[in-house]
């Protein structure tokens, strides 16, 4: 298994000479939500439906770039819409894996909002009751957040798995990605966290630097998942068969 530094250096090498095209593609991808919101009435709905598909298409295009293929700035459109249904199917399956912490978080938020609303509408504010309710709601939200973190990182590479083999069912893709992440979630979390300094710089530059940081981060994460899934050594098929046999 390569170290984080080695993965990042490999990503830099793979992007060498193609950073401009990669940055331009991320720029086009980034302005799409804004353009959709300009469409009266249906814009926000269209954005919610299409954006996850374009996100998948962006990842698929960067996998192609990593493999040395020639890519176009708008390739993420065709790559995304080619697997429109599967992209949504995988996204929904991942959300369903998070149903319990999501439900707890919604209940916690509802408790806090209810306490504030009741206190404001009654006119006679009972600070002790409101405070207890707010604390209970806040604790529920915190528990839900902490609970969701390991689940999120278990299935965070489900879209990568889809990009490598879209012929399988959504549930098989999600479960397979989760099995590859067994014993690797902490490494995946630390890898993501290691980019935090870059994103501080992205904020300082009002997002402009992000057009170069996002390709760097995506390719690094692609390399990481390829290593844990055996694809770096072209052993993904054999490893997948091993996983299914163990079931």
Language model features: what each stretch is:
Residues 1-247:
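Hydrophobic alpha-helical membrane segments
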């Amino acid at each position: 298994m390569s170290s984080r530094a080695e993965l990042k250096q490999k990503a830099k090498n793979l992007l060498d000479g193609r950073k401009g095209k990669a940055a331009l593609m991320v720029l086009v991808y980034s302005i799409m939500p804004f353009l959709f919101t300009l469409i009266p009435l249906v814009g926000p709905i269209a954005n919610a439906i299409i954006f996850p598909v374009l996100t998948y298409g962006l990842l698929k295009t960067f996998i192609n770039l990593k493999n040395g293929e020639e890519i176009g700035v708008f390739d993420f459109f065709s790559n995304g819409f080619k697997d429109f249904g599967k992209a949504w199917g995988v996204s929904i399956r991942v959300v369903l894996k998070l149903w319990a912490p999501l439900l707890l978080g919604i209940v916690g938020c509802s408790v806090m909002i209810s306490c504030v609303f009741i206190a404001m509408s009654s006119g006679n504010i009972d600070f002790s009751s409101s405070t207890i309710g707010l604390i209970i709601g806040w604790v529920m939200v915190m528990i839900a957040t902490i609970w969701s973190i390991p689940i999120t990182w278990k299935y965070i590479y489900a879209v990568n798995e889809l990009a490598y083999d879209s012929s399988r069912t959504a549930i098989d893709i999600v479960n397979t990605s989760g099995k590859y992440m067994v014993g690797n979630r902490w490494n995946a979390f630390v890898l993501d966290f290691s980019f935090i300094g870059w994103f501080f710089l992205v904020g300082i530059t009002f997002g402009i630097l992000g057009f170069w940081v996002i390709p760097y981060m995506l390719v690094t994460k692609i390399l990481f998942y390829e290593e844990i899934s055996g694809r770096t050594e072209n052993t993904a098929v054999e490893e997948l068969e091993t996983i299914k046999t163990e079931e």
